[in-house]
């Protein structure tokens, strides 16, 4: 199955083929700042499953990840690993924003103090253990 999405102004569009590898809510401080939100809800795909068209820009938010956003409207679309493996697609940027449901929380140790997690999903204090 192919799911499509894009930015607020329509200048950047993407297609995601297949099912995501995982769907997580990240509470890390970098995601909080990059998204301007208490957390980043994303569906993670292999980069080869994604096709992106339009005028997107990148910002190196850490040594491993670029944040991809629309140059025109500023919509934050992806957390893109520089090693060419994975990309986290912001869930709300899919045309069908209810296509995927998160199953886990990561970096709960960095969540904002007023955020409560009472959804019964798996929680990790940091990243997923290897």
Q: Can you say where each PLM-predicted feature lies in the sequence?
A:
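A short Gly-Trp-Pro
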Residues: 1-130
